[in-house]
């Protein structure tokens, strides 16, 4: 779901994202991660997919497989502490950036007062669905329990987190597993391979 923010908050987040986070994050991304980066985008991802397809065909012919996938409820299940920790590593845990990110992530927290103590104790690691959450009666959302997970799709910081949060997976697939024909756009990805077993692995 998309949640709006105040104009002053939006200005702060634009500056933080455009001038601070994106230049640092971009250095860590594979070229075939196409979302939310100037000069890339959905058209760039389509072009890269076509390039991969052509190169694959020249190397392997028409034998092989393409595995398409996405991260289940990706934005709903981004854990704030992990995302913030990854971002702060880019800035040697700078105190001011830490403070600013903490304020923003706090605004993303989800009221889960309706949960039992058992549900609350495991909610960070259970799959959260914001669409189902919207069906919870408002009178059960009392502000007593908050979950530090989930980000707002419409927020610019969420877009930065979306491209960066799984970057270790990108690097693992691309470089450790040597999958040249791999690309990702936010939570959607693909791998082309002549080996079905390798893709299943």
Question: Model features per residue range: what roles?
Answer:
Residues 2-11, 95:
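Structural motif
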Residues 13, 42-45, 158, 162:
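Phosphate/oxyanion-binding active-site loops and adjacent basic polyanion-contact surfaces
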Residues 5-9, 16, 155, 159:
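Aromatic-acidic/polar surface patches that form glycan- and anion
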Residues 59-186, 190-200:
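Conserved polymerase palm-domain catalytic core
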Residues 17-79:
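Active-site-proximal segment of RNA-dependent polymerases
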Residues 1-5, 50-58, 178:
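Catalytic micro-motifs at enzyme active sites that drive phosphoryl/nucleotidyl and oxygen chemistry
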Residues 4, 8, 41, 75, ...:
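Catalytic cores of large soluble enzymes that bind and process phosphate-bearing ligands
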Residues 13-18, 163, 167:
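Short, hydrophobic alpha-helix immediately C-terminal to the catalytic nucleophile
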């Amino acid at each position: 779901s998309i949640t709006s923010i105040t104009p002053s908050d939006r200005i702060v987040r634009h500056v933080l994202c455009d001038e601070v986070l994106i230049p640092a994050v971009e250095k860590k991304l594979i070229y075939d991660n196409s979302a939310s980066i100037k000069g890339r985008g959905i058209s760039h991802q389509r072009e890269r997919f076509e390039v991969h397809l052509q190169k694959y065909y020249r190397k392997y012919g028409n034998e092989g497989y393409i595995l398409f996938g996405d991260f289940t409820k990706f934005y709903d299940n981004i854990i704030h502490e992990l995302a913030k920790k990854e971002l702060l590593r880019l800035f040697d845990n700078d105190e001011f950036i830490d403070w600013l990110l903490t304020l923003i992530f706090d605004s993303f927290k989800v009221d889960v007062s309706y949960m039992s103590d058992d549900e609350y104790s495991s909610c960070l690691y259970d799959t959260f669905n914001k669409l189902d959450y919207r069906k919870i009666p408002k009178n059960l959302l009392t502000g007593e329990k908050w979950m530090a997970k989930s980000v707002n799709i419409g927020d610019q910081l969420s877009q930065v987190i979306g491209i960066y949060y799984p970057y270790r997976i990108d690097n693992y697939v691309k470089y450790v597993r040597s999958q040249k024909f791999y690309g990702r756009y936010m939570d959607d990805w693909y791998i082309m391979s002549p080996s079905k077993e390798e893709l299943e692995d």
